[in-house]
């Protein structure tokens, strides 16, 4: 299980990303529309002034129950071994074990 501080840090990043999402998106659209290089640099400086953790690339998908950052399934929001345990315990409706 991931440390609580790591999970809280990830939640803080998600809040920052949501807060600055529209500003970041509008600035990127402006850069593509503006023809002059000096104006592009000004807009780029505005983008750089935003908090670093507000960038969506810094987010990690984490397991809902354990906080594990690797081997996550998007559909369930769980890591692989927790997903397997829950399927074996019949806790996920519609998920079946493969057998051949």
From Swiss-Prot:
What InterPro entries does the annotation carry? Ribosomal_uS14, Ribosomal_uS14_bac/plastid, Ribosomal_uS14_CS
* Gene Ontology annotations of biological process type: translation
CC terms in the record's Gene Ontology section: chloroplast; small ribosomal subunit
- KW Transmembrane helix (keyword) present: no
Q: Which GO terms describe its molecular function?
A: rRNA binding; structural constituent of ribosome
User: What keywords appear on the UniProt entry?
Assistant: Chloroplast, Plastid, Ribonucleoprotein, Ribosomal protein, RNA-binding, rRNA-binding
- Pfam families listed in its UniProt record: Ribosomal_S14
Q: Where in or outside the cell is it found?
A: Plastid, Chloroplast
> What PROSITE patterns would the database entry show?
RIBOSOMAL_S14 (PS00527)
PANTHER family documented for this protein: 30S RIBOSOMAL PROTEIN S14, SMALL RIBOSOMAL SUBUNIT PROTEIN US14M
Listed under subunit, the entry gives: Part of the 30S ribosomal subunit.
Family assignment from sequence similarity: Belongs to the universal ribosomal protein uS14 family.
Task: Describe its function.
Answer: Binds 16S rRNA, required for the assembly of 30S particles.
Protein's recorded name: Small ribosomal subunit protein uS14c
Q: Which gene encodes it?
A: rps14
């Amino acid at each position: 299980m991931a440390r609580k501080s790591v999970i809280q840090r990830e939640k803080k990043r998600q809040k920052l990303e949501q807060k600055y999402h529209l500003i970041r998106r509008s600035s990127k659209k402006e850069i593509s529309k503006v023809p002059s290089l000096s104006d592009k640099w000004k807009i780029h400086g505005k983008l750089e002034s935003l908090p670093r953790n507000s960038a969506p690339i810094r987010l990690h998908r984490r397991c809902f129950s354990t906080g594990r950052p690797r081997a996550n399934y998007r559909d369930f929001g769980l890591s692989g071994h927790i997903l397997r345990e829950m399927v074996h315990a019949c806790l996920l409706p519609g998920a079946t074990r493969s057998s051949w």
